[in-house]
Structures are given as C-alpha cells and as structure tokens.
C-alpha cells in the first residue's frame, strides 16, 4: 500500500522529468546545497545587521588603498552588495550554477512556482502552541496567540513582530541548541509539502519536523519565509543585478524566478534581443502609473507635448484588479482558443476566469467566442478586471470581484454582479512584440482586433486633451460618479515593463482639498498598533447610530453599524483623554461570539474590519472626524466609508444618543455632494519639491521648548535586537541614569545584558567613568568602550523615526569613552566637516553651536541638483504610499502658508519683538516641514494665513477684502497651529487654532479651503 511519502516522491520524480523536458539546458549542481543555517549566518543576518551594527557611514572621508576600499569602509549599499556577491560566489564555487533553491528562500514573495501556504500568524502560533504542548492561557501561549498585544514580561514586551515572538518562546524550550541539520534543498522539499497540504492537521507534522530539526533562530527565519516577510533591507533588484546583468529584464517579462536562475546562470552570456520582450503564456510585470505631482500644469508638462502634437489622454482610473490576458489559437482546445490570466502580482487567475471558450468554470472566457477579429491568432492584453452590476448598470467596489466571479461560475444565467474586463493596452499580436510601439499605435491595433462584448469584455475609453481645464472638468465628473480618479497618459510613449514612469500619471480625488462635513461619530472598537505603537489602541472603529426606521423590531436601541477606521490626527493627550474616559470598559472581541447586540460589522460571519477590542456605545466617547471624501466600500456595514479620515477633537459635550445616525449621514452626504459639484477643485501640492531658502534675517533656531529636559519616554522597541551589552557604570550626561536603569532600557529595546565583556562574542562595553574595570579594559587596548549617551541617542532617534526601519546610530567621537586605533577613522566619518551628524537629529544647543562655527568658517556646501532632489522626493513618497510613516520634514508638504507682513514691524527699530521672533521661528519650521511660505496675500495658491496672537478683530475687514475675490478662501490660524502640529507630528484641526474672536463669532468665519 502506497504511503503519502511514496506518492509525494512519485509526484516529485514526475515533476523533475517535466522540468528536464522544458529546460533541457538547465544548470546542474555538482554538490549538495548548503546547510540552511549557512543561509542565515552568511546572508540573512549580515544583511539585517547592516542597519544594526554601530559603525559610521563612509561619507566623503573614505580612503581607498591600491586595491580599493576595505569592507569596513564601504557604505551600507556597497556592504549590502558585497555580502550578496560573496554568498553567490561561494554558491557557484561550492554548490554549482543552479542557485534556484537558495533564491526561493531568499525571495519567497517572488517565487510563483510555490503555492500559498494558507498560514498566517494566528495559525502558525496555534500550531506552535500545539507542537510545544504549551497551555494557551500561559504567558508564552498568550504571547504567541496575541502577538500584536504587549507581552507579559520584559523579554516579550515588544509587540508587532511575530517571528521575534516565536524566537522568544521557542528559545525557552528548543529541540536543538546547535545548528540544525537541514540542507536548503530539504527545506524547499518540506515547504513544497507544506504548501500542497490543504488542512491544518496535514501541515502540523511538517511544522513539527522543522521544530525538531532547527534551532530557534533557524525556525524564526523559516517563519519569515512562510509569511513572505523577510525584510532583509535588500530588494530583488539588488540580488538580480548581482546574479546577472539581464536578470531584472527577464523577471520583468516573465515573473519567473525559475527562469531567471536557470536561463541566466552564466553572467557572461547575455539575453538575445528576441528574448528581451514579452512572450505568450509568460506573465510579465506591467507598467505602473506615477504618483500625483505638484500641480496639474506640471503633470501635463510630463506628458512631453510638442508643438505638432500637444495631445495627452485622460482615462478613468478603474476600481478593480490589474489583469493581463494571454490568448493563443489552439485547434486541440474546445472552441479553438486557450487563455491565461495573471494579476499585477503574478497570481494566476485562469481558474477563476477560464482557460477556454467552453470552460464551464470560466466566469469570463465563455463570453469571448466572438470577441476577436478574424486573423487574430494570438495576443496579450493589459487591462483592469472590475465588478459590474447588471441591475444598476454600474461598477461595484473592488472587494466584490472574487465574489462576482464565483457567482458567475455557479450560475451564468442569473442577473446581478459579474466580472467585466476593461482592456486599455495590447502588448503582443500575432507573434510580434508591440511594447516598443507608441501607445497611440498600440491603441489603433487594439481597436482593430477586439470586438467588444457588452458589459463583459470592453475597450476602455479615453479622452484627448491639451489643457488643465479639461483635466479639472474630468475630475469633477470623476468625483460626482464616485470614481477612483483619472490616469493621464502620453500617447507618444512606449510600454515600459516593470516601471513606474511619468508617461502614465495618477490624478486621484482623495488628493484634493477637504470634502464634505465634519462628522461626530461614536467609537465602537479599537485596534492595536504595531512597531512603536504596539500594545496600545492606536486606531478606532467608528460607527453610525442605527435609526429607529432602520433597526429591526426588538433590536437593541443602542446598536451601531461599522462605518470607518480613524488613526490620524491624534495627539498623545488625545489618546490619554480617550483612555481616561473609557478605561475598564473595553472588551476583547470574540469572533465566535461577536457582540451583534451592540455592533454590526460588514461581511456576515467574515466580520470585515473586526476590531481587537470593542466597547458599548453608551460607555464610549464621541469624536469629531473630517475626511477627504466618501467612498463605496463593502468592508463597512452601511456600504460606505470615509477616505483618509482624520481626528479633529473629542466631543465631550455629546454622547452616543447625539452622535451621527445612518440617516443623518446619508442626508449630509447628499447635501455635500450637491455643493461639491458646484465648486472648483484644487489639487494639493502632493509631490512638491523643496524650495531653496534664502535667509534674509539672522537664522533663529526652530525649537519651542528649549529648556525641556532630554528624557526617555516609553522604553520599548527593537533597536538593540541581537546585540549584547556589558554596562560598567551609570550615565552622567546628557541625563543621569543608574546602571540598573540603563540595563532595563537596553533589555526593553531588544538587547541582552551580561556582567562580563567575554561571556559572549561581540559584547558592547558601556562606561562613563574610569572605574577599575573600565581602566583594565582600556589598558588592554583592543576593546572599544562606548559612553551611555550612545544608548540614549539610539533610543531617542528610534522614537523620532517611528515607522521607519530600526537603524542604529553610527558612533560619533562624542560617544567614545575609549576607542582603538582602527576605529578612529570610521568614527570620525560619522560627522561632516562642521561636526554635524549624518544620522542623528542633533539638539538645539548643538545646532546653535554648529551654525556659529559655520559662520566663522565661512564655508557652505553646494545644493543638490533639482533632479537629484526630485528623485529622492519621489522615492520617499513611494515609501509613504506603501504604508511608511510620513517623515516630519513633510508634515506641511503641499501647503502654502502666508505670514502677512505687519506694517508696524517694518517701521520699528531696535531688537526684534518677541512675537515677531515667534512668527519667524514658525516660518522656519514650516519651511523645514515642506511648506511653501509667502508674505504676500496676492498669492492665489495660499491654503493658510498664519497670524500672531495679537491679531485683532479690527484687522479682519482689510484681510477679508483682500481675500474676498477668491472662490476658495484659506484657513486663518494662529501661529500655535504650526507649533502644536510640529510637536504632535500630525496636522491638527484648524478650527481649534483660529483667533479667539473668530470662534466667538462664527458668522465671520471664513470658508475653508
């Protein structure tokens, strides 16, 4: 009788035979693959430690010898590449030319040949509890199953890092303390089995084998591979570039890691010209639209219009899933055609949309029998798969797409929702690659080969335009129809594979100025944050009170429908205030017994946007929220939600009974949309290049609380993960900390404490005084001794950079109690010629001294080129759009602040008045944080007028007369709006910072932007 292992071995043998036939020249390794522990020892860990190891950047002081730079003098990018090159060179020498087994583990998110595991953190945590026979209610059981929550001990206090939690728990009960005995190839085989297992009971013994054969660190890395969350600090482009000069190009046209490894195993053999284009039945990486820029004028300029051809195209941005369709004529296939569908992430959706005309499981291809012109043998189309509601003859939100496809599979004759493929590009036709042709030529070809099928398979329309006014008109229409926005396209451009380029540019309504009303919503749920906000409720689920007419008979009168999540705009004081009024009233959400008496979520049993904690409406608070727009969403109970909601203030004058109801919201929405159609839209300065500053007055330091003590608040993080410390003394400066306090700070931030310098390798010695032990270490002369100020600076900088990757500060001369000769040049390289740190945010006093020294030296550095600044700006914006925290230097980005000149100031003599100095400080802060600053009220782009506290009602008429001709008037705020927003690192509500008399007499309040 055949066992499961026998069947698996037979399947593997059959797969190998198929691969040999498909890749007859694939490389063969000459030796077994490296042990799995070598992978993390020589690659994973060194790459992660680049951002951990406290060494200075190379900067502009690097000195190269006759053989180039030493490893210690390489900058982080060069060191990262050096590590990858060494690993690949070793693989080629010791194993062979087939690096595919290693790349599958290094870049698991790019491996399309291995199916998804169907295992997220919760399932893995439950399995580990089972495997290690831990009580789920014990401390370790709780920490594994509730990994986002703060741990119950100092070592497990960090929330939000699941693999770290697993390491913490497994290291207490490891099956192995030495390296495991699994080879990379064995790990791949077991992962293949894991991905093919369909049930948890089939996956459990496989994970148990990993636990038995790996040490805790190996298992933690394996879990990162399973979750496809490596976070190595190096992208696939870096690995591809080191592997072969054509690797990135081949991946762009094939999305196949296997092809990159097997077809490009020899770096000296380049791809042929005919192999550099898209191919039938090979998934490519599509072109993406660039993010919105400073202004419509600038975006239009990026379309590169010419005198002879000034036209650009405007397309509606569709709310669906990017999809590519490959079709080839095949006489052996029923209906004579074969189809393949892939998403932008290279997921194969052929099973959902169909592989042939008569595929009964196909929700789309069954309608494509007559969709192509005669003579079309094969093609590749690029487009968007959307959900279409036949009853409403309108699109549905993106989240309903898979439901629509499955519904169409089950019953193709029912009315309701179904997939609609909107095609906007053709890249391949009858054996010819069209990517090098212009968009206009490709569109002409598309129109000739496609025969649209109504509401099933259509060519996406576009409008030709030459002016900004035409774009603005299309934007009005887009918002009125609740569209995703617009895409501007250059019709003279080629198709750029795997590239986000200015030839296509997004214009989205949510980037416009405020939309609609401020809403008073009741808080009904809370979500724990991750990273620096881990262990605390950092965002809230808000609901709409159910009206009597909408509630079912006998239902709870306090019931609320889920409406939106709010996480922006809160200050530390706001969080504290909410905690104060709701303390002891929060209840953990139980998915098996949801509190449907009080709260109703969307999705039925799926419980969309399920909070971590919930609270009864009568026990909760009401918050005032504003947002960019209202959008359709099936993730919330009423089918609508807010785009980019932002907290304004806590409404302690209201309770749940006076919070917004469902019907009141629908009435407000209808009224706001009617007004919105009549207004002109202003596109915010979304990607504004920083303006060069010319200082006319002596530079003042932008710091509003210069006397505040430097103290550590809330020690918790990962900044010292993997580091070992020996702390010899207490800290004397910049603040006094005892030895025990320093040790607790280190442990709370991931470090380990030892009481000798030689207990473990690479121990960091910390001292601020010349004790007997410190003097003994110094006398040896081979150990660096670092001052405690470096620990405090690292923690402080980590808090400032919350949301960014944890990076240890490079050591500076001031951090060194004693250093060895070979460290002197490296440490000196962490400062520039003015002794300004390359990595650390310096204090006000340090900045003042530095500026004084610069003035004495009379030296200035040249500015970066505008092109370089723009490139860096766009790179940062991509990171922000993908979920990173907005840098403090962009807090006021896109705003134009006017500081009107006071006539009395210009006539006065003597020292600068205190209030004028305060305004000047605010101007510096605003400029530093990305705002454009002007003193002229004639500037039509002004978004805020900033006045000092002495601004009186007698000055208002003149100000209003100056601004009265504008269709949209700016906010008028006191200078402390800038000060308070900067301190809280979030844009605060303008209404709370208007001059006092304007709040007292609301009839004179100016219209908002």
Swiss-Prot record:
Enzyme Commission number(s) of this protein: 6.5.1.1
Known catalytic reactions: ATP + (deoxyribonucleotide)n-3'-hydroxyl + 5'-phospho-(deoxyribonucleotide)m = (deoxyribonucleotide)n+m + AMP + diphosphate
GO cellular component, one term: chromatin
Ranges of compositional bias, category Basic residues: 51-65
Any GO BP annotation: nucleotide-excision repair, DNA gap filling
The name this protein goes by in its record: DNA ligase 4
MF GO annotations: ATP binding; DNA binding; DNA ligase (ATP) activity; metal ion binding
NCBIfam families reported in the protein's UniProt record: dnl1
General function of this protein: DNA ligase involved in DNA non-homologous end joining (NHEJ); required for double-strand break (DSB) repair.
Superkingdom per UniProt: Eukaryota
Annotated Pfam families: BRCT_2, DNA_ligase_A_C, DNA_ligase_A_M, DNA_ligase_A_N
Active site: 317
Compartments reported by the entry: Nucleus
InterPro entries according to UniProt: Adenylation_DNA_ligase_IV, BRCT_dom, BRCT_dom_sf, DNA_ligase_ATP-dep, DNA_ligase_ATP-dep_C, DNA_ligase_ATP-dep_cent, DNA_ligase_ATP-dep_CS, DNA_ligase_ATP-dep_N
Chain segments carrying region Disordered: 1-34, 51-72
Residues reported in the UniProt entry to bind ATP: 315, 317-318, 322, 384, 424, 484, 489, 506, 508
């Amino acid at each position: 009788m055949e066992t499961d292992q026998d069947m698996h071995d037979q399947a593997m043998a059959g797969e190998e035979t198929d691969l040999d036939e498909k890749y007859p020249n694939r490389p063969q390794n000459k030796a077994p693959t490296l042990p799995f522990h070598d992978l993390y020892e020589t690659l994973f860990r060194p790459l992660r430690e680049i951002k951990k190891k406290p060494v200075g950047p190379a900067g502009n002081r690097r000195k190269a010898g006759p053989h180039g730079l030493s490893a210690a003098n390489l900058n982080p990018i060069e060191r990262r590449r050096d590590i990858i090159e060494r690993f690949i060179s070793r693989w080629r020498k010791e194993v062979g030319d087939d690096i595919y087994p290693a790349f599958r583990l290094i870049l698991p998110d790019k491996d399309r040949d291995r199916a998804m595991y169907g295992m997220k953190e919760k399932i893995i945590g439950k399995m580990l509890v089972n495997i290690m026979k831990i009580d789920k209610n014990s401390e370790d059981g709780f920490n594994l199953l509730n990994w986002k929550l703060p741990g119950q001990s100092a070592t497990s206090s960090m929330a939000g890092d699941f693999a770290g939690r697993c390491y913490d728990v497994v290291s207490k009960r490891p099956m192995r303390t030495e390296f495991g005995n699994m080879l990379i190839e064995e790990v791949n085989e077991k992962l293949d089995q894991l991905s093919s297992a369909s049930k948890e009971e089939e996956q459990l013994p496989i994970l148990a084998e990993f636990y038995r054969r790996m040490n805790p660190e190996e298992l933690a890395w394996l879990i990162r591979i399973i979750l496809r969350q490596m976070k190595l600090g190096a992208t696939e482009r870096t690995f591809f570039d080191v592997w072969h000069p054509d690797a990135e190009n081949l991946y762009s046209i094939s999305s196949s890691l296997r092809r990159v490894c097997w077809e490009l195993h020899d770096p000296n053999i380049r791809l042929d010209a005919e192999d550099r284009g898209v191919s039938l039945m090979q998934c490519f990486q599509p072109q993406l639209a660039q993010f919105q820029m400073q202004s419509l004028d600038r975006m239009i300029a990026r379309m590169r219009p010419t005198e002879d051809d000034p036209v650009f195209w405007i397309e509606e941005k569709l709310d669906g899933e990017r999809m590519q369709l490959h079709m080839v004529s095949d006489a052996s296939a029923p209906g004579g055609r074969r189809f393949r569908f892939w998403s932008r992430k290279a997921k194969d959706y052929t099973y959902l949309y169909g592989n042939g005309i008569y595929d009964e499981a196909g929700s789309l291809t069954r309608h494509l029998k007559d969709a192509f012109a005669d003579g079309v043998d094969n093609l590749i189309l690029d487009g968007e798969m959307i959900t279409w509601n036949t009853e409403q003859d309108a699109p549905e939100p993106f989240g309903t797409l898979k439901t629509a496809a499955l519904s169409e599979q089950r019953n193709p004759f029912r009315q309701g929702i179904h997939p609609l493929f909107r095609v906007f590009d053709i890249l391949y036709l009858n054996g010819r690659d069209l990517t090098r042709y212009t968009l206009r030529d490709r569109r002409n070809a598309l129109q000739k080969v496609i025969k649209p099928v109504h509401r099933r398979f259509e060519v996406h329309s576009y409008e030709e335009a030459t002016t900004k006014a035409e774009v603005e008109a299309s934007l009005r229409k887009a918002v009125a129809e609740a569209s995703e926005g617009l895409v501007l396209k250059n019709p003279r451009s080629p198709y750029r594979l795997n590239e986000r380029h200015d030839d296509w540019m997004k214009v989205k309504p949510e980037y416009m100025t405020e939309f609609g009303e401020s809403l008073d919503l009741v808080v009904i749920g809370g979500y724990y944050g991750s990273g620096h906000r881990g262990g605390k409720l950092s965002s809230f689920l808000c609901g709409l009170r159910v009206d009597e007419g909408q509630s079912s008979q006998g239902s709870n009168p306090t019931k609320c429908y889920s409406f939106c999540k709010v996480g922006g705009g809160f200050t530390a004081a706001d969080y504290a205030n909410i905690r104060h009024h709701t303390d002891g009233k929060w209840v953990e959400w139980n998915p098996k017994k949801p509190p449907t008496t009080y709260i109703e979520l969307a999705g039925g049993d799926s419980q969309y946007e399920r909070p971590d904690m919930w609270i009864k409406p009568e026990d909760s608070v009401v918050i005032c929220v504003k947002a960019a727009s209202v959008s359709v969403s099936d993730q919330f109970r009423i089918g609508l939600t807010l785009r980019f909601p932002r907290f304004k203030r806590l409404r302690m004058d209201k309770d749940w009974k006076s919070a917004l109801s469902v019907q009141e919201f629908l009435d407000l929405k209808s009224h706001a949309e009617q007004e919105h159609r009549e207004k002109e839209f202003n596109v915010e300065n979304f990607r504004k290049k920083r303006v060069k500053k010319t200082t006319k007055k002596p530079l003042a330091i932008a710091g509003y609380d210069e006397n505040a003590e430097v103290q550590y608040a809330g020690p918790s993080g990962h900044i010292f993960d993997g580091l070992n410390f020996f702390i010899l003394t207490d800290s004397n400066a910049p603040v006094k900390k005892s030895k025990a306090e320093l040790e607790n700070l280190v442990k709370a931030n991931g470090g380990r404490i030892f009481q000798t310098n030689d207990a473990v390798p690479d121990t960091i010695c910390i001292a601020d005084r010349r004790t007997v032990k410190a003097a003994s270490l110094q006398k040896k002369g081979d150990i660096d001794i670092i001052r405690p100020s470096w620990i405090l600076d690292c923690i402080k900088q980590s808090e400032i950079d919350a949301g960014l990757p944890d990076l240890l500060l490079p050591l500076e001369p001031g951090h060194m109690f004693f250093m060895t000769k070979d460290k002197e040049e490296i440490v000196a390289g962490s400062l520039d010629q003015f002794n300004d740190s390359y990595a650390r945010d310096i204090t006000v006093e340090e900045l003042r001294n530095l500026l004084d020294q610069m003035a004495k030296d009379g030296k200035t550095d040249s500015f970066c080129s505008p092109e370089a600044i723009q490139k860096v700006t766009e790179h940062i914006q991509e990171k922000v759009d993908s979920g990173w925290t907005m840098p403090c230097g962009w807090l006021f980005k896109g705003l134009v602040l006017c500081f009107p000149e006071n006539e009395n100031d210009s006539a006065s003599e003597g020292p600068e008045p205190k209030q004028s100095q305060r305004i000047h400080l605010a101007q510096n802060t605003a400029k530093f944080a990305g705002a454009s600053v002007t003193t002229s009220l004639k500037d039509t782009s002004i978004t805020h007028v900033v006045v000092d506290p002495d601004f009186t009602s007698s000055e208002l008429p003149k100000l209003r007369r100056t601004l009265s001709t504008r269709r949209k008037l700016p906010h008028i705020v006191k200078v402390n709006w800038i000060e308070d927003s900067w301190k809280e690192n979030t844009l605060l509500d303008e209404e709370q910072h208007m001059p006092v008399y304007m709040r007292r007499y609301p009839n004179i309040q100016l219209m908002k932007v």
